[in-house]
């Protein structure tokens, strides 16, 4: 019987996982797709820069395709997303065209939130922005309200909370915004809006969030001042951006699935190559180390301003731990797979201060508790986190991704270490960030 089989079921795809009775080990080397956060930003900055931007290693998943689709509709020339090298002919800052159609961000919150910062400052242009059913229920007020403080004219459904959105571009004014949450999307949206203002736009956060926008904006020529002590970033407007060559490293959020899988499956050893290890993203490595994982960075290097390494991971005996606070923004997307690690660890793991997971592609706290619970995991759900009693064997079950890519992949890893058959409904969600995930899983499971 095949370890993995993917079949169409009604209007969705169903993944069946049949681990052998003796268990399965993962061996070999692999590369994960390009970093999703960096891919979005490279496309956007290329579109608003002057001249040509060449992007190598771009994630060819559904979310960056949504970004490319939106910016093509506003006049940017972006080559087809089907090769290792993508070429963007930029319009120049403030020169995006008014589109003749609705801008559809698909499932991508990053596309919608960051793009709003650019649209708000496109004078004399009207934009309508929407997304899929999931995105139309994710909160947009967190970027709309500070943009309105800058003078933006934005209308949103449900009293300013949700897409669809209408944006009337206007001249924005700089502000100093104290964000109530540490969010790279909020910060990036406002920095992009600040590019066209006359003066300094500053964003101060309660904790450090990922800094890909700051690194890339500086590479494209924007003038920024960064204060790591107060978690503040200032962009000095108006800016002039020039097209660049961008090499996108592998996505640590995608690598996390392999790091956990090889840790919990006895006899496993994987080398995950070319992974971005930006310190604003490495919370997952710190928590796994705290749990006793055997992960070694090799061949550390800098690639177009981003730290990169190959990560060697060997099977180990994990122990439960507690994490929360300032580390959460540095591993927010990895919590679903860390919950799987916790289910296979000895002892109790407690995840705190993670209420942001309730407004991701799904309510990820509820999804983890529900779907891992169906497999026999002992998960207690709190308003802002989870408690997981590890060490009890999981059993195969019929579960659902809830159309969330990270839930789909986390459940597949849990299924490999479970007894009996697992069926994952709506498994096609994985293609949002990792189109080759199931194929790669089949390869490394064969050794």
UniProtKB/Swiss-Prot annotation:
Keywords, alphabetical:
Amino-acid biosynthesis, Aromatic amino acid biosynthesis, Cytoplasm, Transferase
- Role, per record: Catalyzes the transfer of the enolpyruvyl moiety of phosphoenolpyruvate (PEP) to the 5-hydroxyl of shikimate-3-phosphate (S3P) to produce enolpyruvyl shikimate-3-phosphate and inorganic phosphate.
Where is this chain's protein located in or outside the cell?
Answer: Cytoplasm
Cellular-component GO terms for this entry: cytoplasm
Which source organism does the UniProt entry give?
Answer: Synechocystis sp. (strain ATCC 27184 / PCC 6803 / Kazusa)
User: PROSITE patterns, from UniProt?
Assistant: EPSP_SYNTHASE_1, EPSP_SYNTHASE_2
Q: What protein does this entry describe?
A: 3-phosphoshikimate 1-carboxyvinyltransferase
| Active-site residues (renumbered) | 333 (proton acceptor)
Q: Which InterPro entries match?
A: Enolpyruvate_Tfrase_dom, Enolpyruvate_Tfrase_sf, EPSP_synthase, EPSP_synthase_CS, RNA3'P_cycl/enolpyr_Trfase_a/b
Name the family the entry cites: Belongs to the EPSP synthase family.
User: According to its UniProt record, in which pathway does this protein act?
Assistant: Metabolic intermediate biosynthesis; chorismate biosynthesis; chorismate from D-erythrose 4-phosphate and phosphoenolpyruvate: step 6/7
User: What does the annotation say about its assembly with partners?
Assistant: Monomer.
Q: Which gene encodes it?
A: aroA
Q: Where does phosphoenolpyruvate bind?
A: 36, 109, 138, 185, 364, 406
Predominant place of localization: cytoplasm
Reactions the enzyme catalyzes: 3-phosphoshikimate + phosphoenolpyruvate = 5-O-(1-carboxyvinyl)-3-phosphoshikimate + phosphate
Q: Binding of 3-phosphoshikimate: at which residues?
A: 36-37, 41, 183, 185, 333, 360
Q: Which GO terms describe its biological process?
A: amino acid biosynthetic process; aromatic amino acid family biosynthetic process; chorismate biosynthetic process
- Select a single GO molecular function from the record's annotations and give it: 3-phosphoshikimate 1-carboxyvinyltransferase activity
